[in-house]
Amino acid sequence: MHTHRPKPGFIWKFTLLIAGGLLLSSSVSNPENPSVAVGEPIVWVQNKAPKVPSQDDLAGEPVPFESFGVREQLDREMVVNTYHHSSTMLYFKRASRWFPVIEPILAEKGLPDDFKYLAIIESGLSQVVSPAGAAGFWQFMKGTAPQYGLRVTKEIDERYHVVKATYAACDYLLEAKEEFGSWALAAASYNMGKAGVRRDLEEQGVDTYWELHLNSETARYVYRLLAIKAIFEDPESFGFSIQADALYQPYATRTVWVKAPIEDLSAFALDEGANLKALKTLNPWLRSSRLTVAAGDSIAIEMPV
């Protein structure tokens, strides 16, 4: 049996007409609802294009807006991160908890404060694992981590230790800055590796990040860092209004020094007046249900107060 079906275009037009009629009827003639004024216009919410600054810097190094493509590339990242609302809002919430941990380490190691935003573009300040296997706030690969003092075993993975991984990231960035002479190139190397930056600089015959033709991810990397920095420095200009009580607060913890093996971390947590969920949340670097402690060694574990 054949039936006549209206064309898809007609269905869409008809649906829009009905939807428009419902909207108009609710705002124009609803005498039983005094909260809706007769003749009240429909207000369409429009997104506002974020303003690209006329000048900017990364860690004190000026951004060369006169260079080819620089302004437009920064504009793209500002648009993406301004209107990536849920993720950017979570960045603000998590930063309230973790920047007080990260900032003093950067200062101690002599890194510019701008590099705290690197942890946001790497992981969103979450203990995530990339498809390539990079892990933690600072996204160290398993093979690279030990080179920067991070222990990785079946029971312990210090890529997830925020304090230790931050120190390791600082060491990497300082090495890269020493080699390339630029914080922008140091940041780029954090994404693609020192060898990759070294190769591209040599092959292309340029000497700055802003002139390099890079893979799509690294080409956006420093611009994304700059965009996040701009949004964090003036959130209301980008449409973010964050109440203090909506931010995540730093964890209140006490340190327990463990000098003997723990056969059952669940039982250990209960003995300390907590539970495994709290233990693993505060110590995500504990990757097993037990913990081996060598003779004469001691390991610091954070527990809720």
What are these regions (language model features)?
Residues Q243-G273:
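Primarily a LysM-type cell-wall glycan-binding module
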Residues H84, T88-F99, E108-L111, S130-W138, ...:
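Solvent-exposed, acidic/flexible segments
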Residues L111-S126, A186-M192, L279-L282:
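Short, functionally critical alpha-helical segments immediately adjacent to catalytic or ligand/cofactor-binding
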Residues G133-T153, T166-A169, L173, V197-D200:
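Substrate-binding/active-site groove segments that recognize
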Residues Y190, L265-D271, A278-K280:
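Short alpha-helical segments in extracytoplasmic peptidoglycan/chitin-binding modules
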Residues H2-G110:
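An acidic, Gly/Ser/Thr/Pro-rich helix-cap/linker signature
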Residues L173-D200:
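Catalytic and binding regions of secreted/periplasmic enzymes and modules that target cell-wall glycans
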Residues L282-V305:
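Extracellular LysM carbohydrate-binding repeats and other cell-envelope/extracellular binding modules
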